[in-house]
Amino acid sequence: MTRLAIPPDIRFGVGGFPLAFTERPEAKDRGAVFAWLRSVGLDAIELQMTYGPRMTAEQGRRYRALAIADDIKLSIHGSYYIVLASPDPAKVLRSVDTLLRTYEQADILGAREIVLHPGSLYGAPEADVSRRFAENLERFMAQLGKTDISLMIETAGKVGQMGSVDMILDVAATIKGVGPCIDFGHVHARSLGGLE
């Protein structure tokens, strides 16, 4: 079998803690995931912060040390409750707070990317909602200031959600510190099986 030479900056990993790990006895200590990933030939993990950044600083520092020891790249998937496109200013403020805390968590972990879904269309045209999202995101990034942590906006898998490839690329091209995260499974679902 011919092995491909993979450039050193390309990593392969998992999102969250896979069943193949969590069903093992050593999974009682979630920190064992880093050695397990290395043992199965993977070198990256996206930590899921579905309900927000709840990890203690001590646990974050421990995960960072374990990830470095096993050469595992860490990234974070931000909470689905971060809704910068919401028409409700109170929800946007809560979202800004959660996203700021996610950046703090990423810094402790040594993660250099935070992945974020742009959210619902709220029954409005994508152009209108994506404009509100981009304006709120631009204000957030200005408030955040200089950072080496990139915010990666991910494509959505449902047509009723904001997150087309074009929208993601437009936002990433216009806001400093923001990049695209193209999830091909989501693109395939969004296009109703359109990827060949």
What do the PLM-derived regions correspond to, one by one?
Residues 44-48, 76-79, 104-108, 145-146, ...:
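Short C-terminal domain-edge/linker segments immediately following a structured domain
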Residues 2-10, 174-184, 188-196:
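Histidine-acidic metal/acid-base catalytic patches
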Residues 1-101:
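N-terminal pre-domain/capping segments
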Residues 68, 85-180, 189:
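Active-site acidic/histidine proton-transfer and metal-coordination neighborhood
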